[in-house]
A protein has these predicted regions:
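Nucleotide-sugar donor-binding catalytic core of glycosyltransferases
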Residues: 1-164
Length: 164
């Protein structure tokens, strides 16, 4: 297995929260020899230099192995060169686009975002004892979030905001 936890601790990296998609993936996969788990969303949001990250973790890479990872950040494409350098050839991403299955030899697979309002006990009281198949749903959507056009892959959020 690729022991990244020591690096995460040493360099004070952390899993993003409350949307802990990468952390949940890490907890499920950390014992798999080919899983390369790092908090990519934090690396992006904290603007860590990718060359620095590469130099910190490259000793963990066995060039004979092909690794996989999970990235929950919408700007995942910026990591492609780093992932290639780390021999990561498969990435589970939360912002998978239909028809984009490979970028520069890296396979992209979908991974659901951690649903904070459902998965976290302190937020999910409204969902207890609900028959999700048959319940009437008077609300079309319950999450809008922010709208920063430069950050999104499509204009769906603009359409949601236009409906309000």
């Amino acid at each position: 297995m690729v022991h990244t936890q020591d690096i995460i601790d040493k360099y004070k990296l952390f899993w993003q929260y409350p949307a802990i998609t990468e952390k949940q993936f890490y907890l499920q996969e950390k014992d798999n020899a080919l899983y390369f788990g790092l908090p990519w969303a934090t690396i992006k949001d904290k603007r860590y230099n990718h060359s620095l990250i590469f130099n910190i973790v490259r000793h963990l890479v066995n060039k004979d192995h092909k690794y996989y990872t999970c990235c929950q950040h919408i700007s995942y494409k910026m990591f492609i060169p780093l992932w290639k350098a780390l021999n990561i050839t498969k990435v589970y991403i939360s912002h998978k686009q239909v028809g984009i299955d490979y970028i520069d030899g890296i396979e992209l697979l979908p991974c659901p975002l951690f649903a904070v309002n459902f998965e976290t006990k302190e937020y999910n009281k409204d969902f207890e004892n609900i028959d999700f198949i048959n319940v009437e749903r008077p609300i079309l959507y319950s999450f809008i979030g922010g709208y920063q056009p430069r950050d999104y892959m499509s204009n769906i959020r603009k359409h949601i905001f236009d409906m309000i």
